[in-house]
Amino acid sequence: MRNINDYVEKYYNEPFEPYMVQIRKNNIIKQLKKYSHANILEIGCGLSPLFLDFQGFKNMVIVEPGEDFVVNARSLSENKCDIQIFQGFFEDYVDKLKKIAIEFDFIVCSSLIHEIENPQKMLAGIRDVANENTIIHINVPNAQSFHRILAKEIGMIKNIHEQSFQMKLMQRQRTYDIDLLKQEITDSGLVVIDSGTYFIKPFTHNQLQRCLDEKIIDEEVLDGLVKMEKYLPGMGAEIYVNCKKR
């Protein structure tokens, strides 16, 4: 059983993650702009809800289990009548979401299904609240990331799917490569319409944070590493898929 309070406490102290959150969010916004996005459902908003960086929507609904994250999101969205925030696990809100008078154009499930015990249950819930035109965006860390392949080649891990100490600390249940993620999606009754990876991550979160702290690299280098994916396709730090109901 996932301990959400323990997760939230450790999330505050995870090195480099604020940078990764922004890189991840930039890719989500890139995907949003490709499709209809008037009504958006965000499953899990963390400390940085999508509405902070993207305002091109009519309605946004957020479902987030972490109390600290919900308090923060409600404070940031105060007096915004186009944003609804529910506290709880998404799987427990499926019936309520089906009853609200909003047809979702775009559903964001960001950096989540690798952390939960039963991704098929969550994907079934997503399928239930989606309609035939809804785009569902899912992203997860990539087992075939440059930094994991490097770790294998120097003997730090035995295989690219091996769980690291940081993964275990953050209650992450599994590692996906693109084929495993597509299979997970297909098994749930969804169909993948496009996919990709983003951000060439040369080192671990801890190592990258040290590089930034010691001014060995700066955010311009991070921007360059985002652009580097076109030279190393499939080796980005994270995978995304956009999918629909069959």
Residue ranges and their predicted role:
Residues M1-Y35, H37-G46, H137-I160:
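Conserved class I S-adenosyl-L-methionine
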Residues P18, S164-L180:
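Acceptor-substrate binding/catalytic loop of class I
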Residues Q120-I135:
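A short glycine-rich, Lys/Arg-flanked "PGG" loop and its adjoining helix->strand segment in the class I
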Residues I4, Q183, D194-R246:
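A C-terminal cap/extension of S-adenosyl-L-methionine-dependent methyltransferases
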Residues V108:
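A conserved beta-strand element that flanks and buttresses the S-adenosyl-L-methionine
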Residues C45-Y93:
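Class I SAM-dependent methyltransferase SAM/SAH-binding core
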